[in-house]
Amino acid sequence: MKLRGVNLGNWLVLEKWMGASPLSVATCEDERGLIDEMPSGELELALEMHRRSYITEKDFAWLARVGVNLVRIPVPYFIWGTANHLSCTEHLDNAFAWAERQGLKVLIDLHTVPLSQNGFDNGGYLALCAWAQDQARIDYVVDVLEALARRYAGHPAL
C-alpha cells in the first residue's frame, strides 16, 4: 500500500509556530511555560476546548475523501495525565475510532519526553534538553511507549 500521510501536529502536543492553540494567545513559548502562566482551571478548559475543536471527525472524513490514508499523531509523554498535565487518551482513542471509520491508518509519534528531547517548543521546554541525563526519565519514556503499544497494538487503524 502506498502511504499518503499528513501530520496532525499542534493538536495533542502544542506547537506555537503552527498557530491556533492556547499558546498563540500566551506570552510563553512552550507548554511548560503555559502551565506556569495560566491558572490551573483556565489551562484545563483552554486545552480541552482546543483538543475538542482543533481536529475533529470531520477532518478525518475530509482527509479520506482527498486520498490521505495515514495520519501521524504527535502525542506527549504525559498522554495518561500527570499532576501538571491533562490526559489526552480520550482524544487519541477518538482519533483511532475516526480513522477506522474512514479507512485511515494511524501512526503514533511520541513527540515529547520529560525535560525535552530537543530543546524546541515541541518538546515542551524551550532551550532545555535534559531527558537523556537521567535513567529514571528514560525508563519512564520506555514505560509510556510500552503502554501505548499495549493499548493500540490490536487496533485495526494501527
Where are these regions (language model features)?
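Residue-level signature of transmembrane alpha-helix interfaces in integral membrane proteins
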Residues: 23-26, 119, 125
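An active-site-proximal structural segment forming one wall of the substrate-binding cleft
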Residues: 44-71, 81-112, 122-158
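N-terminal carbohydrate-binding accessory modules
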Residues: 1-68
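Residue-identity detector for glutamine
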Residues: 29-32, 102, 117, 133-135
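A short alpha-helix capping/helix-coil boundary motif
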Residues: 37-40, 73-76, 127-128
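A cross-domain feature marking catalytic cores of carbohydrate-active enzymes
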Residues: 6-10, 73-77, 108-112
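Short, solvent-exposed loop/turn and secondary-structure capping segments
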Residues: 15-19, 83-84, 117-119
